């Protein structure tokens, strides 16, 4: 893998002078190897190592090089045609291959090559971009989007119209990460490398970016960029110091342990905050 990484890194440093005509066959093969590895789950743009998320920027560089070097081509989807640099993941998939994958793909769900979809995942009419990693047992509901390089854990439910932000550039930016057993409510947006830790529930219409204040009503603390494990989060507002206005925030209304999260329904967890 090191030689593959070195080849990608060197080419990216010299990307301004590269074209499809000048790129070596070794480089083209390396880019295709990375895209195939992302597609089958061999590679991940981000992974948890010793309890911390590590981002492999060189994989993002390979994707960006593919955009620069590969020409647009016609993609025949049967009901219409597309014109893009990256083919669709399931265009040539046979019945046997679908059965082996264990994935259900409802008509009009779109997945680009280079996104990994694990078994027991259901894709309603939705969009999954290149470099995304979707683990086992995930539901991606209607009109939801999973952006480039986003990382989705096991047994996550991404509700209708929700958006999980993607990131390829700038290279220093981290992907958005939803850890295991999380629920993302309808029309919510989680973007800009925000991490939602395991067993959390995000209510409908919650917007989370790096500049979004996250208010913990239990402790009174304000944080940014990360939802702690087991949090139940709703949309809210915080007043200004002079009381002249209020600004949007996300509110952690409670935190539950894994056993409670498993036993109590999503609706009960969200309704509980209305009694206070």
Curated annotation (Swiss-Prot):
Xref: Pfam families: Hexapep_2 (PF14602), THDPS_N_2 (PF14805)
Main location: cytoplasm
InterPro entries linked to this entry: DapD_Trfase_Hexpep_rpt_fam, Hexapep, THP_succinylTrfase_dom1, THP_succinylTrfase_N_sf, Trimer_LpxA-like_sf
Compartments in which it is found: Cytoplasm
Superkingdom of origin: Bacteria
UniProt: substrate binding residues: 104, 141
Catalytic activity annotation: (S)-2,3,4,5-tetrahydrodipicolinate + succinyl-CoA + H2O = (S)-2-succinylamino-6-oxoheptanedioate + CoA
GO molecular function, one term: 2,3,4,5-tetrahydropyridine-2,6-dicarboxylate N-succinyltransferase activity
Biochemical pathway: Amino-acid biosynthesis; L-lysine biosynthesis via DAP pathway; LL-2,6-diaminopimelate from (S)-tetrahydrodipicolinate (succinylase route): step 1/3
Gene Ontology cellular component terms for the protein in this record: cytoplasm
EC class of the enzyme, as a word: transferase
Keywords: Acyltransferase, Amino-acid biosynthesis, Cytoplasm, Diaminopimelate biosynthesis, Lysine biosynthesis, Repeat, Transferase
E.C. designation(s): 2.3.1.117
Single GO BP term: lysine biosynthetic process via diaminopimelate
Similarity comment text for this entry: Belongs to the transferase hexapeptide repeat family.
HAMAP family in the record: DapD
Subunit structure: Homotrimer.
Name of the protein in its database record: 2,3,4,5-tetrahydropyridine-2,6-dicarboxylate N-succinyltransferase
Encoding gene (name): dapD
